[in-house]
From Swiss-Prot:
Site for Transition state stabilizer, residues: D77
Record-given protein name: Uroporphyrinogen decarboxylase
Family in the record: Belongs to the uroporphyrinogen decarboxylase family.
Gene transcribed to yield this protein: hemE
Record function comment: Catalyzes the decarboxylation of four acetate groups of uroporphyrinogen-III to yield coproporphyrinogen-III.
UniProt xrefs under Pfam families: URO-D (PF01208)
UniProt xrefs under SUPFAM superfamilies: UROD/MetE-like
Intracellular or extracellular location(s): Cytoplasm
């Protein structure tokens, strides 16, 4: 059993207020670190990098050694789940992820029988990382939420507006929901494996939840997220789950109430006073510094850190960004951020 008194993030996720708040950053293991780039050069491609427990464990640990973040987050990618579903995924330098576009009407072709075989190495990464962590550091596992994963599968990669996917969700609702269910079921199995391999917290990233009408948001974001949470709990896994429906706007409260997540992560556009007034009482919140101000540094960074610390004071809060850290952020700015937070007491 985890000793909550030693792990500030677990304290917050249990509903406690910790001052100063614990901090970690999305994409904290990444290209802004020279040591990451050195390890990355040893893998022939990004997918192989993710599936190499030795390399993935090393880059997971790098930001902990350098900065002493309160959490390590598993180094992996949300698009490993489509591989387990039987889809091809590859990364093109300068272009990002590429997939063979998938027709949701063929959802029954998606494999449900090879999750452990394909994703088992991710559990091995966790088993390598956990023994190396300081006693106060929490291990976070994660996966992409079904809607966001589906957008990449249907579009064949990244998309500015996910239009093809949204059309498919309206045009073929039964097939589309069947596809989401298959993604959700494999994702749940994947997260259960992560928890059994040492993850103390799980996070679901719905990076493309923005701009959906409420009926569609309910169908493609809330419903499959709840399906995952329910499956994880039914397997006897009781670790906290953080949900991040980025860009959900006024639908954040519904997501928080209806999915069963323990805590909610919010994006940079969310007003702290508003979200505190509409969330379930005492629900922990993670976020939500603008990554651009971290890149800018200086007085602007100090001012934004102070503003967020003031606005979240007295609440169970984990300090993070509202989106992932960018590759061009100077290490000195991360050090400045941490010093500003940790100097508050």
């Amino acid at each position: 059993m985890n000793d909550l008194t030693k792990k500030p993030i677990l304290q917050v996720l249990a509903g406690e207020t910790v001052s100063p708040p614990p901090v970690w950053l999305m994409r904290q293991a990444g290209r802004y670190l020279a040591e990451y780039r050195q390890v990355r050069s040893r893998a022939k491609n990004f997918i192989d990098f993710c599936f190499s427990p030795d390399l993935a464990a090393e880059v997971t640990l790098q930001p902990i050694r350098r900065f002493g973040f309160d959490a390590a987050i598993l180094f992996a990618d949300i698009l490993l789940v489509p591989i387990a579903l039987g889809r091809k995924v590859w990364f093109v330098t300068g272009e990002g992820p590429q997939l063979e576009p998938f027709d949701p009407r063929q959802f029954e072709e998606l494999r449900l029988d090879q999750t452990e075989a394909v994703l088992g190495s991710i559990g091995e990464t966790l088993k390598r990382v956990v023994p190396e962590l300081p006693d106060t550091t929490t291990m976070i596992g994660f996966a992409g939420s079904p809607w966001t994963v589906a957008t990449y599968m249907v579009e064949g990669g990244g998309s500015k507006d996910r239009f093809r996917t949204r059309v498919a969700a309206w045009e073929y609702p039964e097939a589309f929901d069947g596809m989401l269910d298959r993604i959700a079921d494999v994702t749940a199995e994947y997260l259960i494996m992560q928890a059994r391999s040492g993850a103390e917290v799980l996070k679901l990233f719905d990076s493309w939840a923005e701009g959906l009408p409420e009926p569609l948001f309910e169908r493609v974001v809330i419903r499959p997220t709840k399906r995952i949470v329910d499956a994880v709990r039914a397997a006897g896994i009781d670790v906290p789950i953080i949900g991040f429906p980025r860009g959900a706007g006024t639908l954040y409260p519904r997501y928080a109430r209806e999915t069963g997540v323990t805590a909610i992560a919010v994006d940079t556009g969310v007003d702290p006073a508003w979200i505190q007034s509409v969330l379930p009482a005492g629900m922990p919140v993670q976020g939500h510094l603008d990554p651009s101000v971290l890149r800018a540094g200086g007085a602007a960074l100090d001012g934004e850190v102070d503003r967020l610390l003031d606005q979240w004071a007295g609440r169970p809060h984990i300090f993070n960004l509202g989106h992932g850290i960018t590759p061009d952020v100077p290490v000195a700015h991360v050090e400045q951020l941490l010093a500003r937070i940790r100097d508050r007491s």
